[in-house]
């Protein structure tokens, strides 16, 4: 009788551990997916900001960034 209780406890413990492990693995995959989505959003936001800054540059800023030697065309 005592042996059977020990076996039952052991099986219950194993069942709980596998259940907890499955839940943790599911949470891990969800967190990873959320992190990937967040990184994609941040990257898209950085690209959008960069385009906005580039669009709003003045002629002088564009000229200063140019690799061309504008003195040749003066």
UniProtKB/Swiss-Prot annotation:
InterPro entries, per database record: DUF3886
Organism: Bacillus subtilis (strain 168)
Basic and acidic residues: compositionally biased ranges: 1-13, 20-60
Protein name as annotated: Uncharacterized protein YqkE
Composition bias type Polar residues, residue spans: 64-74
UniProt superkingdom: Bacteria
Family annotation (Pfam families): DUF3886 (PF13025)
Region span, Disordered: 1-74
């Amino acid at each position: 009788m005592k042996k059977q209780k020990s076996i039952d406890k052991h099986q219950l413990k194993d069942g709980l551990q596998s259940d907890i492990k499955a839940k943790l693995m599911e949470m891990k995959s969800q967190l990873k997916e959320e992190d990937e989505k967040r990184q994609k959003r941040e990257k898209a936001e950085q690209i959008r900001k960069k385009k906005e800054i580039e669009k709003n540059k003045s002629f002088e800023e564009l000229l200063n960034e140019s690799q061309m030697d504008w003195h040749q065309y003066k």
